[in-house]
Amino acid sequence: MNMIEQLEQEEAARVLGEKTIPDFSAGDTLRVHVRIKEGERERIQVFEGVCIARNGGGLNESYTVRKISFGEGVERVFPLYSPNVEQIEIKRKGKVRRAKLYYLRDRRGKSARIAERVTGRGIEKREPKKKG
């Protein structure tokens, strides 16, 4: 392991603290709890939608979540190691064959649905990929 990878691992551990990041991919329906500061007040806002992409790697990794709000498509890009993201919940696993689901931007209604990946035991537990 080179020096940069080691520094990135240490920084990721420092930023995460007690939080854990679930293993999710494109097609999964997520609930992202985001900390929002409005003046003196601070609150948690939940953004629920389909993960349509994961980008980057290391500390710079991010993911895009899309939802339909009042008939309009809304997308937010969250850094994976953001201190403003309080928690990430996986609501359901999606069965898709693509890593990037940008084609969902052009779809509405039933054609934008994603089938659920079923294992027979609820949300499937995957081991994180090992590099090397």
Curated annotation (Swiss-Prot):
InterPro entries: Ribosomal_bL19 (IPR001857), Ribosomal_bL19_CS (IPR018257), Ribosomal_bL19_sf (IPR038657), Translation_prot_SH3-like_sf (IPR008991)
SUPFAM superfamilies hit by this protein: Translation proteins SH3-like domain
GO terms under biological process: translation
UniProt GO MF annotations: structural constituent of ribosome
GO CC annotation terms, alphabetical: cytosolic large ribosomal subunit
Protein family membership: Belongs to the bacterial ribosomal protein bL19 family.
Name this polypeptide is given: Large ribosomal subunit protein bL19
The species this protein was found in: Maricaulis maris (strain MCS10) (Caulobacter maris)
